[in-house]
Amino acid sequence: MSPQAFSDSVLNWFKQNGRKNLPWQIKVSPYKVWVSEIMLQQTQVITVIPYFKRFIKRFPDVQTLANSSLDEVLHYWTGLGYYARARNLYKTAKIITKKYQGNFPLSLNEIMSFPGIGRSTAGAILSLSYDKCFPILDGNVKRVLTRYHGIKGWPGKKKIENKLWSLAELYTPRKLTKQYTQAIMDLGATVCTRRKPDCDICPLTLTCFAREMGKQHDFPEKKLKSVIPKRDTVFAIMENNNGEILLEQRPSSGIWGGLWCFPEFLSHLRIEEMIKRKYGFNIKQQKEYKPIKHTFTHFHLTIRPIHIKIRIYKDKDYDTKVLKWIHPKTNPSLGLPAPVLSMLIDLNNTKRAVLNE
């Protein structure tokens, strides 16, 4: 199939079957495309939609985002995971507002220079917003191309990725680039899916290598799995006499960077001594909760929560910028890791149940 025939087939399929009413497709703007593309990294469309709507309602344009606090941005990202995406979004918003007066540049290289934006995201911004002829290569497109051509090897390898970029460039038409970009993404997301590709309705089925060989599930090849290490940590859920819970902001780098979390300890051993030394608190009562399992891309984490009631707390030179007392029934405008948010909700529900007895 010629490149022209390939793109025409995908475009004709899109006219009848493509997704045209996603939130970021309504009143399209570079800002909306950018936010949606960042959210869609590592996250499915169905999960992203409510987060995107809520985020855009609060931050309707790049200037509003740039003028907000990082804490609030992380708060609206809570639950999506991969929080470096939100931090980079915030950094880039400030750059665009300050250096470009709130307007996205039309240069691919300039957009790629922004934090968290690679070639595919930059291409999506330019093609979907301005109909510029730049290819994209997200996970959906990689899957379509590797299956269609029977490309062996993990797509994350530079050699394989370069080959895929060459094909993406070859098939991206100079006209109707915007429609083709959305079409090839939709084809991968809704037809050429990872687990159950629906080859019978695919516009490329007659000339697809994987379909012809019956090897759809062999492509794209997966990265060789390494053993994922396991880690343990203790979360101290410290409650004062007012029923407030102590949260501590994590360092900007590392896991859950910049988010607010329960104070963390390596072990429950001598935890009373460590809490008194660090925070000046005397412990009235403590109770261990059932461990919580949480998985990151590169390790499994077992969280062991301990609910600790504080008898008194001394006046101490605290850094109030990184320590906050919050009530579990409130919804603070802070970025919270999903397990922390879940534990706060559970704690509030437990308190309500006790009061209603």
Question: How would you label these PLM feature ranges?
Answer:
Residues 1-20, 25-26, 189-357:
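Intrinsically disordered, low-complexity, charged terminal extensions of DNA damage-control enzymes
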Residues 4, 9, 13-198, 204-213, ...:
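Catalytic cores of DNA base-excision repair glycosylases
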